């Protein structure tokens, strides 16, 4: 991404793709002026977006290998998205990633990042690359020569070895702190993870913390409100010290619901009952105000006990 311009026009480049070998296709939006075939233009890269895309691309390679080491060698890439803001990776796996596995995947990636090792690239034949253990995309067509990207030095070689023609960081430390923020299933046997790194991750975590703080404040206010309402019925709220705020809030809501139901049933203005007796048969007309519909079954059950033979309306 960047800008294409000359004295007569300015175009914002929003995407660049390599097609049919060495043909580069730029997709852009004209912001000013006009452009004609044959004109010369200047190209200016948006360095911040470029650097973020590089780091997210390198992080994707580290993520791929970390997934394979944690979940198993059956993990293969099924798709990916690398943008300046985030990265997304689709892979073969038939069940959700467990909490312990997720922690391990993130830990492995961050350990390679923190090792601060140089990223290496080499040009070789596809056969040589595969012999070295390089991962290749199934169904992808490769030429006589391929570019292989090596990341993270280990005693017996490299942490990650993949065929790749894309842009990458020079050193793993440029990736910054990494974390998977979501996972989902997109097809049978295919999982998707989305991840953030560095500045975007910090912003995401700060936003989450802000949301948590606000939610906790709202829950505390709601808890106090319910406690006061329960006390207004001259009943002591039942709170457990062993349960967290959210659990206590749920329990108090249930207590308040039961109290309200009992008070409606006891209140003759809100629970109007009119029985009409025909021989040994009773027709009961009952009108309830401010009563939750889901609790009507309990009222009907009580009515059955009151009248052995009859109809409740």
Question: Model-found features: residue ranges?
Answer:
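Active/ligand-binding-proximal structured segments within catalytic/core domains
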Residues: 1-3, 36-91
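Short, hydrophobic beta-strand segments
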Residues: 25-29, 43-49, 86-96, 195, ...
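Conserved nucleotide-binding/hydrolysis modules and their immediate coupling elements
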Residues: 1-43, 48
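Terminal appendage regions of diverse proteins
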Residues: 10-11, 74, 172-177, 181-313
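Extended, well-ordered alpha-helical scaffold/bundle regions in very large, multi-domain proteins
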Residues: 78-116, 207-212, 216-238
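Conserved phosphate/anionic-ligand binding catalytic regions in large, soluble enzymes, centered on
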Residues: 1-4, 55-71, 75, 157-192
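Short flexible coil/turn linkers enriched for glycine and charged/polar residues
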Residues: 7-10, 19-22, 35-37, 83-85, ...
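Non-catalytic interaction/regulatory segments
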Residues: 84-186, 195
